[in-house]
């Protein structure tokens, strides 16, 4: 599976460094 960052991003942004909002609405390592 995709490594997640323990964060959701319904607003479209992730606060965790090195993470992107993909697939929405879950932050994953980019």
UniProtKB/Swiss-Prot annotation:
Keywords: Disulfide bond, Knottin, Plant defense. InterPro entries: Cyclotide, Cyclotide_moebius_CS, Cyclotide_sf. SUPFAM superfamilies: Cyclotides. It holds the Pfam family Cyclotide. GO terms for biological process: defense response. There is a cross-link at residues 1-30 (Cyclopeptide (Gly-Asn)). It comes from the Eukaryota. This is a cyclic peptide. Disulfide bonds join 5-19, 9-21, 14-27. Probably participates in a plant defense mechanism. The presence of a 'disulfide through disulfide knot' structurally defines this protein as a knottin. Belongs to the cyclotide family. Moebius subfamily. This is Varv peptide G. It comes from Viola arvensis (European field pansy).
